[in-house]
């Protein structure tokens, strides 16, 4: 424990802002040339002769480095890539043979649309989101107790992807679902580890509450802002 003199020193320091750097203490606008802090703009599409704007930007970067585009992939390879990325599984023989045999000029667009409408799409992309927000179906720590109702939030995320929920609503529902009528969405806030191995004393329980609140703040920062706010608990962000 701190001595009375040490406690008084801390009180004095807080009272007169001893040691504070005025440049840090004063709030200021973010000054950085990092791309994530720049205003969103629509850049002009490079004129490279490609039909897809993404290919045009890729081609421009390759040209600047004296590189060339890879040959166009075969239909078989494209179908395989599409299913692996969107559903996490390779196409069945029936799917592949049916696509290759079709003479429909719109078969690629139809295949993509069918994949997006399949429930597996939501299951696949929900995994990416749940990993990002530190979702777990157990509490962690020594006891690692199962969370009997965690699946409700997991299924809510899957349904949100399959229903094509607008992103602004998706975010709002997870941060303030209890206010906007999407209570299941707030599972985001408590998806992290929960320490049940704490002593009965009030001090340790209060500390555990602060740890969980800090976890919520850090998860919000890393998920929606791309910034690690957790270090600001002990350090000044610059």
Placement of each model-derived feature along the sequence:
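Sequence context surrounding c-type heme c attachment/ligation sites in exported
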Residues: 1-7, 181-238
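Aromatic- and Gly/Pro-enriched helix-to-coil junctions and flexible linker segments
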Residues: 1-178, 237
């Amino acid at each position: 424990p701190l001595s009375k003199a040490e406690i008084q020193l801390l009180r004095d320091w807080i009272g007169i802002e001893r040691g504070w750097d005025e440049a840090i203490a004063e709030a200021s606008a973010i000054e950085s040339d990092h791309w994530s802090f720049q205003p969103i703009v629509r850049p002009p599409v490079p004129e490279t002769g490609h039909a897809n704007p993404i290919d045009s930007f890729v081609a421009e970067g390759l040209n600047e480095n004296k590189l060339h585009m890879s040959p166009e992939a075969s239909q078989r390879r494209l179908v395989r890539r599409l299913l692996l990325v969107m559903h996490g599984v390779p196409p069945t023989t029936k799917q592949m043979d049916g696509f290759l045999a079709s003479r429909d000029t719109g078969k690629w667009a139809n295949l993509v649309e069918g994949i997006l409408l399949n429930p597996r799409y939501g299951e696949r992309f929900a995994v990416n989101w749940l990993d990002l927000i530190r979702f777990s179906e157990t509490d962690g720590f020594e006891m690692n107790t199962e969370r009997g109702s965690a699946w409700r939030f997991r299924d809510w995320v899957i349904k949100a992807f399959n229903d094509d929920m607008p992103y602004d609503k998706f975010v709002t529902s997870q941060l303030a679902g209890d206010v906007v009528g999407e209570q299941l969405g707030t599972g985001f806030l408590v998806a992290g580890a929960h320490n049940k191995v704490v002593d009965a004393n009030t001090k340790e329980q209060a500390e555990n509450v602060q740890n969980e609140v800090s976890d919520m703040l850090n998860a919000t920062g890393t998920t929606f802002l791309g910034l690690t706010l957790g270090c600001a608990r002990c350090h000044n962000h610059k």
